[in-house]
C-alpha cells in the first residue's frame, strides 16, 4: 500500500475558493458557445502541494466515483461513453451519440495520437518510459489538442495539455519528486474545475507509484476561467462555507502498469465535505 504523508493536523486550503471569489468579483461578462453567458477572467494559476493532502474540494461534496472512473476511461483510450454508462457514470451523456460515440476525445488522443504514416503514438506509455529513463527531460508532455481531429470530437478538449517535472526527492529511497502542470483552455470553475484538479492529482499519484517517485505539486493553469450565469446562486452558497482540511489518498496495490488500475484500488481517507450543490451543465 502507498499512502500520502501529510502533516497533522492537515491545514485547510482555500486556493480554489479564493479563485472562485476572484472571478465572481473581478470577472467580465462575456457571451459563450453555449448561449448561457459567463463571468470570466483570462489566465489564472493554482498550486497544490500533494504532500499536504489530496486536493478534493471540501466546500461541496464532489462525486469521486465519477472522477476515478473517468480517468480510468481516459487511460483505456476509449472514445465511447458506454463503458462509463455501464458503471453508472453519466457525465458524458450530454455529448454522446445514441450509441455512446464521442469521436476521438481525450483518451483516444492520449493513447492513439495518429501519425502521418498511419501509425499511432501512445503518449501515456511514452510518459512512463521517459519518467523511468530520462526524468530530467523537458519534453514529458501529453496533448489532447489534435487540431486535425477537433472537428470529429463531440466536445473539444477543455483540459488540453499537461507536462511532468521530476525534482530531487525528499526520501533516499525515492528516485525523485513528481509534479504535473495542466493547461486548461476553458474552465467551468463551479462544475468542472474541482473534477479536473482531483483527476490530474490522481494521475500524478498513479504515475509516481509506477515510476518509484514521490509526489510533488499539481499546478493548475487556466485560460478562459468562467462562472456560468446559471451557477451564480450555487457559487454564493459555496462561498458562504468554510473550507475544511483535504483528505488523503491511499492506493491499495501497485498494479503491473499505469493501465491496470481498478476503481477499488483507491481509497480517500478523511474526506469531510459540506453537502453537494447541484447545478446545470452548459452544453
Curated annotation (Swiss-Prot):
Swiss-Prot/TrEMBL keywords: Cytoplasm, Methyltransferase, Nucleotide biosynthesis, Transferase
Enzyme class: transferase
Keyword Cell cycle: no
Database matches in Pfam families: Thymidylat_synt
Localisation: Cytoplasm
Pathway(s) it belongs to: Pyrimidine metabolism; dTTP biosynthesis
GO molecular function, one term: thymidylate synthase activity
Binding residues annotated for dUMP, in chain numbering: 33, 138-139, 185-188, 196, 226-228
Residue positions of the active site: 158
Reactions listed under catalytic activity: dUMP + (6R)-5,10-methylene-5,6,7,8-tetrahydrofolate = 7,8-dihydrofolate + dTMP
GO cellular component: cytosol
The protein's role, per its UniProt record: Catalyzes the reductive methylation of 2'-deoxyuridine-5'-monophosphate (dUMP) to 2'-deoxythymidine-5'-monophosphate (dTMP) while utilizing 5,10-methylenetetrahydrofolate (mTHF) as the methyl donor and reductant in the reaction, yielding dihydrofolate (DHF) as a by-product. This enzymatic reaction provides an intracellular de novo source of dTMP, an essential precursor for DNA biosynthesis.
Complexes and interactors: Homodimer.
NCBIfam families with a match to the protein in the record: PRK01827.1-3, PRK01827.1-5, thym_sym
Family statement drawn from the similarity comment of this UniProt entry: Belongs to the thymidylate synthase family. Bacterial-type ThyA subfamily.
Protein name: Thymidylate synthase
Organism listed in the record: Methylibium petroleiphilum (strain ATCC BAA-1232 / LMG 22953 / PM1)
